Structure formats: structure tokens, C-alpha cells
């Protein structure tokens, strides 16, 4: 087996996304964080620009950094979902706001999505 077969990526899928399946009926479609995904680079630039000095001097709070990361993933990485419900079992429409809420409420899910992206 070659390194190329292990690490070469599909540039089309990096942008159009892949489905992550959780349980029997929950699908979350994600794009790649980086690589051939120009939307990710643009969103990171736009979201972090107001905080660049804090980021560079490492004075940005952990809470703000985590919030920015959730917003970036909600806007540039998660492309959609199906079968996602809130804590009461009510269907959650895919919106950026709902994605940020889900990431904040379920940090282990967010960690998994970050690892997969």
C-alpha cells in the first residue's frame, strides 16, 4: 500500500461533503476543514479578523475561541443534516443557529465532527 492511496483526498468531496451517520437515522453532512474547501478559509478569515490581535497575543478567552470555532463549523463545514432532534425529541431544522446550539449542548458530538472534518 502506498502513501498516495492512504492520504490522497477527493477534492470534490472536500467541498460537497460526506455524510456522517449517527445511530440508525441521523445524518450530518460535512465538508473538509481546510484542503480544497475555500469557503472554510474565507469564513475563518472573516470570523477571526476582529480578534486577530487577541489570537496572536494568545489573550483571547477560551469561551470566545470556542464560540468562534462553533460558528465557523456551523457556517463552513456542516452542510446539512437529517434526523436531528432537540432534547425533547422535536425535529431541528438545519440552520447555522441550530448547529451552533447543538455544538454547544453536545460538545462530544462537536469534537467528533471536528475530527472527521
Where would I find each of the regions flagged by the language model?
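Extended acidic low-complexity intrinsically disordered regions
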Residues: 1-14
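Short, surface-exposed, charged amphipathic helix/loop patches that serve as local interaction elements
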Residues: 22, 26-117
Amino acid at each position: 500500500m502506498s502513501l498516495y492511496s492512504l492520504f490522497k483526498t477527493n477534492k470534490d468531496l472536500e467541498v460537497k461533503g460526506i455524510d456522517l451517520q449517527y445511530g440508525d437515522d441521523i445524518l450530518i453532512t460535512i465538508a473538509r476543514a481546510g484542503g480544497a474547501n475555500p469557503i472554510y478559509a474565507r469564513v475563518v478569515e472573516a470570523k477571526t479578523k476582529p480578534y486577530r490581535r487577541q489570537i496572536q497575543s494568545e489573550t483571547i478567552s477560551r469561551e470566545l475561541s470556542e464560540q468562534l470555532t462553533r460558528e465557523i463549523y456551523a457556517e463552513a463545514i456542516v452542510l446539512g443534516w437529517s434526523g436531528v432532534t432537540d432534547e425533547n425529541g422535536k425535529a431541528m431544522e438545519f440552520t447555522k443557529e441550530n448547529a451552533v446550539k447543538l455544538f454547544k449542548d453536545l460538545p462530544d458530538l462537536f469534537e467528533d465532527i471536528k475530527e472527521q472534518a
